[in-house]
Amino acid sequence: MMSFSLLSIVSIALAATVSATSDGTNAYTAYPSVAKTASINGFADKIYDQLPECAKECVKQSTSNTPCPYWDTGCLCVMPQFGGAIGDCVAKNCKGKEVDSVESLATSICSSAGVGEPYWMIPSSVSDALAKAANAASATTSVETATKSAAAELATTSDTTIVASTSHESKVAETSVAQQTASTEKSSAAETSRAKETSKAEESSKAEETSVAQSSSSANVASVSAETANAGNMPVIAIGGVIAAFAALI
């Protein structure tokens, strides 16, 4: 009777095993296979090459403070002490999009290992520190952008001022040159007019001198003629006087 009971139990167990294998309800087949080795650890290996440089040293955390095998990705993802150490390091060394990249990769690797939400389990204080690191970089970027924009506007204004000043100086210089040219032309015209007046005066003076000389010459000629005429009359008068004297004596 007892042997029959043992045989029945073994048969039932074998039937259950065959049934479970044939219908595919083995719970372990629902999870991905896990490599039981890692060069760094089960968390870091698959994402290391995609991490920003600031986070690569952070994921090289020791797994000795966890009950997990160092190669077990899923186990490491749910250990706050392990994930928290990585998160603190990232918050101190990375900023902005670098932080976002690390969190995205961590979520992806933990989700792939079969871990449910929130996938990468870290303390809330570490989560806050990561958020501040990301936001601080965004604020810094905004300030830098505003500073660069202001500098660009200042440079543009300065260039405009320089151009305007140069244009003004150029116009002033052109005006000055034009004024000097006009003044020179006026001076030349005045000198030309003076030269003409001087020439006319000299010509008039020469004409007057010539006229005076001609008048003087005419007068001299007339005087000489008169003297010559008088000289011609003198013998006649003298002869007449002699004749009169003789007549008186007789």
From Swiss-Prot:
Gene Ontology CC: one annotated term: fungal-type cell wall
Region spans: Disordered: 165-219
S-S bridge residues: 54-94, 58-89, 68-75, 77-110
PTM comment, free text: The GPI-anchor is attached to the protein in the endoplasmic reticulum and serves to target the protein to the cell surface. There, the glucosamine-inositol phospholipid moiety is cleaved off and the GPI-modified mannoprotein is covalently attached via its lipidless GPI glycan remnant to the 1,6-beta-glucan of the outer cell wall layer.
Alphabetically ordered keywords of this record: Cell membrane, Cell wall, Disulfide bond, Glycoprotein, GPI-anchor, Heme, Iron, Lipoprotein, Membrane, Metal-binding, Secreted, Signal
Presence of the UniProt keyword Electron transport in the record: no
Main location, first listed in the record: secreted
Signal peptide region: 1-20
Gene Ontology MF terms: heme binding; metal ion binding
Domain (CFEM): residue spans on this chain: 26-137
Membrane topology reported for the UniProt record: Lipid-anchor; GPI-anchor
Location within or outside the cell: Secreted, Cell wall; Cell membrane
Metal-binding is among the record's keywords: yes
GO biological process: endocytic hemoglobin import into cell; intracellular iron ion homeostasis; single-species biofilm formation on inanimate substrate
Biased composition (Basic and acidic residues): 193-209
Functional note: Heme-binding protein involved in heme-iron utilization. The ability to acquire iron from host tissues is a major virulence factor of pathogenic microorganisms. Involved in biofilm formation.
Similarity section: Belongs to the RBT5 family.
Domains as described in the record: The CFEM domain is involved in heme-binding and contains 8 cysteines and is found in proteins from several pathogenic fungi, including both human and plant pathogens. The CFEM domain adopts a novel helical-basket fold that consists of six alpha-helices, and is uniquely stabilized by four disulfide bonds formed by its 8 signature cysteines.
Protein name from the UniProt record: GPI-anchored hemophore PGA10
Organism whose genome encodes this protein: Candida albicans (strain SC5314 / ATCC MYA-2876) (Yeast)
Name of the gene this protein is made from: PGA10
